[in-house]
Design a protein with these regions (language model features):
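Positively charged n-region of N-terminal signal peptides that target proteins for export
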Residues: 1-6, 19
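Hydrophobic h-region of N-terminal signal peptides that target proteins for export
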Residues: 10-18
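Short, hydrophobic/aromatic-rich segments at coil-to-beta transitions
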Residues: 20-24, 50-53, 122-129
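Short N-terminal segments immediately surrounding and downstream of signal-peptide cleavage
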Residues: 21-36, 41
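A short beta-strand micro-motif
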Residues: 22-29, 53-57, 89-90, 716-717
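Glycine-centered tight beta-turn/hairpin loop motif at sheet-sheet or coil-to-beta transitions
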Residues: 29-31, 58-61, 723
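Structured surface patches comprising rigid loops and adjacent beta-strands/short helices at the edges
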Residues: 37-46, 67-76
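A composition-driven surface/loop motif
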Residues: 79-811
Length: 811
């Protein structure tokens, strides 16, 4: 009984301690039964059965019920507020208790029930605001800077903003405990927390909790007309009719936590700049045309964590009207809705430093990154996943310039036909797309277009593409398709790893490019293509390109040996204009199994090879093809086709230097084929094998040539008359060809030329022997080679072209 009486007396005493703002603590056997700020208590009453103390707030609602028998002792926490150095406002239902030590120093406070108005001319006044009211507000008019601590404040206004800093002063808001601000839906002000001047948010480090919860029923959750700076604390916008946080100037977010789960419009909307240097921000906007973050000025992020999600149509995760820069921190953006974008800028986007960015988009016609001007990246790690049809990973109107960092992109949407000027035009799902040029000098690229992406492009420029560095792993697996443009006009669309409508320059970098869909291209340009640099190091540029998809029938033909139809053929490397190879290591394969059309290297104009280490293998068509002229001036070159020509040109051909082996299939296919056009040989070592060969044009050739008629699979050795070995070569076993053409069979023509061949000299040609030892490269032997058995013939070279019978039947 005495314990109960003692506790009751202490509880009654506690009700007079509001000015000290202590916490009341009930103990039981060394444990805390209950703790609450005294300012939260509106009353305490007692139950007789069981004998208990009931704690109510100022509105009469029960906070807790504690059995008297369980209480060992009662103490007060040391959160003491010296009443002489700050203004203390304690809201209590429809009333408020005010302690104003500066009444004679220019601070006037008026009270109308729970609505408090402050007028201050004093500089640096500290305010401490606490308590609870469902029908109260605080308006501050000050022409000088002030500091306000919110401590376990729950304030709901019945008519206006919960807190309104009505004049343009600098406000430091210190968060202590758990605070909630709610405005009235009919308020004429812009937000539950309205700040006319600058706002800085910090936390009270003596308290373990520093939360501000805001409900904006009239318009915004928080509105700041000046600069808003957040250094610490947790801000939760529980709901808002419009923007979660709205600002007319800048936002400087240096630390603390922000949560905006469902604003009525945008999450953050600032007319100035936004700088994020730390903290954690989680923003989700779900209405149509919403922006998770909207900024009229510069957006810059150096550190911290930013998580943004939007789900409405025509929405933006981050929308910047000016330059957007991310050079640190972690950014995650999730996008849904028709035509929505992850990160969008009207000017320039720059990814730098240690930035970690992940964007996932399911938006139809959406973009993970969208710039109406340029996009640059020189560092960071970016992962983009977009699955909507005709969507883009990176889309720019201006130049894409990438010099470093890591990009991983999965583009699983597909192509759609759009109507433009009464014609069907394909719109693609593309990983990186520029309406102008793409310039890449470094970085790591992992790009995948799965089978769901029909006809998509990995890296695509409407203008020129220039790549001078970087490590590229690109795979396209979706099939292309034929479509009707209008009336009876047909066309097709196919996937590409690298695609430019203008010119393309590949001077350095490592490329592993794979295209498996029908009609797929590895590298495709509508203009000229330049590979490598003059006299460059072959190790500086590594090109591994493979296609395996079959051709697409666009229009059917009328039969005949070539069919006569129109096809979209798979190509590993294709240039609509001139193609020049200066250096680099190229390994190019077309492994189609059903139809021809899969050429490894093709130019629809001229092909010039000045250098490089080139190997091209085609299973069903020419390994290398040019339309008007093919010239080899240098480099090491190997071309092989199982079913067609090794090296083919529909116009003229010139072999002026380099080392070449070119293998075609059985008759009528050839190692070197330029039909009946000029075939010029002036230098280099060249071996061409196949069922036949184009005949060199003797009037323009300056280096002697041997045309050796032999058999498929024969070993050939060519020696000077003194026994010096010029060439040891194992002819390939021919495949393909034949059919309805005359000949077929195992007959093979080997065209050979070398600077060691001289007119007026005799040479020994051995054939059908056995080669042992040495080092072999595609049938060509060097080093310590022994040749045994077989037959031989002596050849007198008295003309530019000398025909040799080495067990063959001629062509």
């Amino acid at each position: 009984m005495r314990r109960a009486a003692f506790i009751v007396a202490c509880l009654m005493l506690s009700l007079g301690l509001h000015a000290q703002e202590k916490t009341i603590i009930l103990h039981s056997q060394g444990n805390v039964l209950y703790e609450t700020p005294v300012s939260n208590l509106g009353g305490i009453y007692f139950l007789s059965s069981p004998i208990s103390a009931v704690f109510n707030n100022h509105d009469g609602a029960t906070l807790n019920t504690v059995p008297i028998s369980a209480i060992d002792s009662l103490t007060f926490g040391n959160y003491d507020i010296p009443s002489g150095d700050r203004v203390i406002i304690t809201f209590n239902g429809n009333d408020a208790e005010i302690i104003n030590p500066f009444a004679n120093e220019g601070v006037i406070i008026e009270k109308s029930q729970g609505d408090i108005t402050v007028y201050s001319t004093k500089f640096g006044v500290p305010y401490f605001v606490t308590g609870s009211s469902t029908n109260g507000s605080l308006t501050v008019n000050s022409n000088s800077a002030l500091t306000m601590t919110l401590h376990d404040l729950s304030l709901t206004s019945g008519s206006t903003a919960a807190i309104n800093f009505a004049t343009a002063c600098d406000v430091e808001l210190i968060l202590s405990g758990d605070n909630t601000l709610t405005d009235n839906a009919n308020s004429a002000l812009k937000a539950a927390l309205q700040v006319t001047g600058n706002l800085t948010v910090n936390e009270d480090t003596s308290n373990n909790e520093h939360v501000l919860r805001v409900q904006g029923n009239a318009k915004h959750g928080i509105n700041v007309d000046g600069v808003m700076t957040v250094n610490a604390g947790t801000i939760q916008i529980m709901g808002s009719d419009s923007d979660g946080v709205h600002g007319s100037s800048d936002l400087l977010w240096n630390g603390g936590t922000l949560s905006i789960p469902a604003p009525g419009s945008d999450g953050l909307d600032f007319s100035g700049n936004i700088h994020i240097a730390g903290g954690n921000l989680d923003i989700h906007a779900n209405t149509e045309s919403a922006r998770g973050i909207k900024v009229s000025g510069i957006f810059e992020m150096a550190d911290g964590t930013l998580n943004v999600g939007v789900t409405g149509n025509d929405s933006k995760g981050i929308k910047c009207d000016s330059t957007l820069i991310v050079h640190g921190g972690v950014v995650e953006v999730n996008v849904a809705g028709e035509g929505s974008n992850g990160i969008s800028s009207d000017q320039h986007i720059s990814i730098e430093g240690t930035a970690e960015i992940t964007i996932v988009s399911t938006s139809h016609d959406g973009k993970c990154f969208k710039s109406d001007n340029t996009f640059a990246m020189n560092g960071g790690n970016v992962t983009l996943t977009h699955s909507g049809d005709v969507s883009k990973g990176i889309k720019t109107v201006g130049v894409v310039d990438i010099s470093g960092g890591s990009l991983t992109i999965t583009s699983s949407g597909s192509t759609e036909l759009e109507t433009v000027n009464n014609q069907n035009v394909p719109a693609y799902c593309t990983a990186i797309k520029s309406d102008t040029d793409i310039v890449i000098s470094g970085g790591t690229f992992h790009i995948t277009l799965p089978t769901t992406n029909h006809g998509g492009k990995s890296i695509s420029a409407d203008g020129n593409m220039t790549i001078s560095g970087g490590d590229f792993t690109i795979e396209t697996h979706g099939n292309g398709a034929a479509y009707t443009v209008s009336g009876s006009t047909k066309d097709s669309y196919t996937s590409s790893c690298l695609k430019s409508d203008g010119n393309m320059v590949l001077s350095a970098g490592t490329f592993n490019l794979t295209s498996t869909g029908t009609g797929g291209k590895g590298i495709n340009t509508g203009g000229t293509m330049t590979i490598g640099t003059p006299n460059g190091n072959n190790d500086d540029l590594i090109l591994n390109v493979t296609t395996s998809g079959e051709r697409i029938t666009v229009t059917s033909g009328g039969g005949g040996p070539w069919g006569g139809g129109d096809y979209a053929n798979p190509k590993a490397i294709k240039a609509q204009g001139n193609l020049t190879i200066n250096s680099g290591t190229l390994r190019v394969n077309c492994t189609q199994t059903q139809n021809e059309g899969g050429e490894c290297i093709e130019s629809k104009a001229t092909l010039t090879i000045n250098g490089g280490d080139i190997e091209a293998y085609s299973k069903k068509d020419d390994a290398v093809n040019a339309r008007t002229n093919l010239t080899i001036n240098g480099g090491v070159y190997y071309a092989h086709s199982d079913a067609n020509d090794g090296t083919d040109c529909n116009g003229t051909m010139a072999l002026n230097g380099g080392f070449c082996i070119s293998n075609g299939a059985r008759q009528p296919e050839e190692g070197f084929d330029c039909d009946n056009n000029q075939f010029k040989i002036t230098g280099g070592t060249h071996i061409g094998t196949g069922g036949g060969t184009s005949n060199p044009t003797t009037s323009v050739c300056t280096q002697p040539i041997l045309k050796i008629n032999t058999q498929s699979g024969y070993a050939i050795q060519i020696l000077k008359s003194d026994g010096t070995v010029i060439c040891t070569y194992k002819c390939p076993t021919l495949s393909g060809g034949g059919g309805g053409w005359p000949g077929g069979g195992s007959g093979l023509v080997m065209l050979f030329t070398d600077p060691q061949l001289q007119t007026g000299q005799s040479y020994i040609v051995k054939y059908n022997g056995t080669i042992n030892g040495g080092t072999e490269w595609h049938g060509y032997y060097t080093g310590n080679v022994t040749y045994s058995g077989g037959s031989q013939t002596t050849v007198n070279v008295n003309a530019i072209v000398t025909t040799v019978n080495a067990g063959g039947s001629g062509w």
